[in-house]
Structures are given as structure tokens and as C-alpha cells.
Amino acid sequence: MYRIEFSRKAAKFYKRVDAVTVGRINNTLEKLEENPFGLPNTKHLKAEFIGSCRIRIGNIRIIYSVNDSEKIVYIEVIGFRGDVYKK
């Protein structure tokens, strides 16, 4: 089982969204703890996010990377589709 860690930016978004969205994100994070590689709607990213993956939850995106040796899933960014890929 993997451990979830949030970046500041991801934690900030997580704290300010509504309860329904938090529930959807929590459901996905529980699945990521079990298996960060085998979820549907997951895609390996390119360009500036190389080495990271993206999971889609409706119009929300979670960008994360996995450290297999330490069993950590690091949540880099959580946000709406239009905002998550901006710097």
C-alpha cells in the first residue's frame, strides 16, 4: 500500500473545494493508495510533467508521481482542467 503526500498547491485546492468534490477526490485517492498504476482514466504525461501521471475525475485533474522504492504517491497538482496545466 502506498502513502499519499500533497504538494502545497494540491493541498490548497483540496481545502477549498466543495464536499461533493472532496468525496470524489478521496475515493480516487483511496484507489491510488492501493494501485497507482492500474486505474482507468490515467495517462502518462509528457513535456514539463514528464515522469508524472494524470488521472481524470470529471473536469478535475490530479497530476501525481510515484516513488516505488519508498511507496509514496506524491500529488503534485489538483485542479480544474483549464488551470492544472498552467504554470
Predicted regions: what is each one?
Residues E30-R54:
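A short, surface-exposed loop/turn module that caps and links secondary-structure elements
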